[in-house]
Amino acid sequence: MKVGVPSHGDFIAGLSVAGLLLPEAVAYAGIAGLSPARAIFAAIMGCLAYVLIGRSRFAVVSPTSSSAAILAAALAALHGSANDPGQIATLVVLISGICFVAASTLRLGALTGFISRPVLRGFAFGLAITIVVKQLPTIVGVPVPTGNLFDLLIGLGIAFPRWSMPSIALGSAALALLLALRRIPKLPGALVVLALGVGVSAAVRLPGVTLVGPINMTLTQPALPPYSWELYSRVVQFTLPLVLILFAESWGTMRALALRHGDSLVAGRELGALGLANLASAAVSGMPVGAGFSVGNASEGAGAASRATAVAAALGLVLLIAATGPLVARLPAPVLAAVVVAALIHALDPAPIVELWRLRRDVVVALSAAIAVLAFGVLNGMLIAIVLSLAALLRRFATPHVARLGRLGTSHDYVDIQRHPEAVAPSDVVIWRAAEPLFFANAERVLTAITTGSGDCRLVIVSLEESADLDSTALEALIEFDASAAKRGVRVQLARAHDRVRDLLTRAGADELAARTSFSVDDAVDAVRGAATP
C-alpha cells in the first residue's frame, strides 16, 4: 500500500484529525509537565515518519495519554537539581525509538503477549482515573502539591474553601459541551470548545481562572543530559515499560482497525515504524509517540482511505498552529483540563471489566491492574499488573483440569464424561487428558491425579494432545510415571503424542514408551487392549 497523493477524502479526514491532535497535544504535554511545543512537534514528526514504513491506513502516530502519564512518572522520579526534565524527556524518546527498532530487527513483536487484554484494560482504567484526578486542581483553580493520588485528593479537600467557582463553572461547561458535540462525529468538538474558551477569556474577565500562556514554537536543537551511568541506566529501566505499553496500545489499535476493514499488518514492521517515529520525535525534542485509540478511530470515522491521511493531518496541524498559535495563550486552563478528561471518557467505561466479570474470566487480574496503578503509581502499577498476569497464567496452567474421557455414541470421538454424560467410558480402560500442556509446574500434579483416579485399573491411556513439547521436568515425570505403573502391573499407552514428544522420549532412552504411542485415542484403546490380550 503506497502513501500516494492525498485524495480529497484524505485531505478532509486529515484536517478533521488535526483538529483533534492540536488540543490533545497541548493536553498531553500538560500531563507530562512539558511545553506544548514538544507534543505538537512530536505529533507532526510522528505522523510524517510513520507513513514511510508503517502500513496502517488509520494509525495517527502522536503523543498518547498513557505515554504522557508514564513519561510524567519517569520525569518525577529522575528529575533532580542537576537534571533538566526536557533533556531527560528527549533521552527517554531517543531510547524508546532505539528499543522499537531493535525489537523490530530481532522480531520481538510477540512481546506484547506479555500484557494480556484484561491487564491492558485494567491498566487503562486505572491510568484514566489517575489522569482525570490530576486534572481536578486545574478545574477547581487551586494549586495542590503533586504526589500520589490519595495525597492529591486530601490536598484538594483541605483546599476546598479556596476553590474557584468561575474556574469550576468554565471547566464543567466545557466538559458538558465536549460530550454533547460527540453526537456530531465529523465535527472537531475539542477544537470548537478550545476556540470558544479563547473567545470567552478574551471577552469576559475571569477572576481565579488560570490561562495556558504563550507557546514558544521555536525549534531548538535536541540536547541530552550529561552522561552518567546511574542516570542513563535508570532511564532505560523506565523506558522499557513505556515501550511495552506503547506498542501494546498501538498494536491493539492498529490491529483492531485493520481487522475491521480486512487489512493485513506485520507486527515487526509496525515496531520499526514506531521506532522511526520516536527517533524523529527525539530529533525535534518531542515526546514519546504511538498510535492512540481515540485518534485512530477519529481517522477511521472521518473517512481516511490511505496513509496519506496522516500526512494531511501533519500538514493540517502545521496550518492550525500557524493560524491559532498566538490565541492558545488566551486559553483557560480549566477548558484544557476538560479536553483531557473528555479524551479519556472511553477509558473510564467499566463495561469491558464488567464483561470480564460476566464471563468469570480474568476480572481479578483486570481489577488488580487498575488498583495497582492507583495505589503504586503508573510505572510500578504496570509492572505489578504484568507480574499478576503472568502469575494468573502460571496458576491456570499449574492446576489444569484432568478429564476422564469416554466414547461419544458409536463415533471415534472421546470426550470429557463430566461435560458429556451421554459419553460412555470403557470398563476395562481409563483414558485421561489434561486440559493444559504438561510442564515443570504441573507434570507431577497431573500424573499423580491420573494414578489416583485410575484405581485398580490395569490399562491406562494418557492423551497428550495439549502437549506439543515437553520440558525436562515433564519428560522425566512422564518416564517415572510409566516406570512406576509398570511395577504395579499397569500398562500405559500414550495417545495423540506429537512427533517432538516421541523424539524426546527416544533421545531420553525411553524407546519402549515411545513405541507405545498412538495417533488417536481410538487407536490407543485398540493398542492397549491388544497388548493386554495373552
Each language-model region and where it sits:
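Secondary-structure transition/hinge residues
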Residues: 79, 185, 204, 454, ...
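The feature marks cytosolic C-terminal regulatory regions of anion transporters and related permeases
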Residues: 346-508, 512
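Short acidic-hydrophobic, aromatic-tinged amphipathic segments that line or gate anion-handling sites
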Residues: 513-527
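Transmembrane helical cores of multi-pass ion-transport proteins
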Residues: 1-411, 509
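Intrinsically disordered or compositionally simple regulatory linkers and C-terminal tails
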Residues: 1-2, 525-534
